[in-house]
Amino acid sequence: MKIKIPLIIFIFFISILFFGLFIETKLIQSPLIGKKLPNYELVELNTGYKSDIRMLPRETFLLNIWASWCLECIREHNTLTIINEDKKLKIVGVNYKDKREDALGWLSIYGNPYIYNIYDYTGELGLDLGVYGVPETFLVDKNRVI
């Protein structure tokens, strides 16, 4: 009996770990769907000028959270570059928890599909957006609703 209880507990935790590996995290929906973008006060990545929600487009746009240290961001960046070619849908970037010089270097290597880039060096805006990890992309309407 003494061996059965620890064995059952062990099997239980291994089962949780095993099933956790197969949960598709890309299918996790944002709790902000249908809600307005949060206000923020940060800086623009390229210029260092103050940035807030008033600087964002008043039309439908993509909001892409990315970082230079994110390998998956390179693959998504290629897709964003293709989307940007016809200029029909504007893309705003949020550089997340990154070093400014690394982010600017990354954009010079891979190209810059963004009309505007918010520098979220502390992750404050990402936290307000409920970011699980980078990259994440939100479709935002003209009323700034996700």
Where does each model-flagged region fall?
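Structural microenvironment flanking redox-active thiols in thiol-disulfide oxidoreductases
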Residues: 74-111, 121-128
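Hydrophobic beta-strand anchors of alpha/beta hydrolase catalytic cores
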Residues: 62-63, 91, 137
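A short beta-strand-turn-helix
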Residues: 40-61
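Aromatic-flanked redox-active Cys/Sec active sites in thiol-based oxidoreductases
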Residues: 64-70
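N-terminal targeting signals for export/organelle localization
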Residues: 1-43
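Thiol/disulfide oxidoreductase modules built on the thioredoxin-like
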Residues: 108-113, 120-146
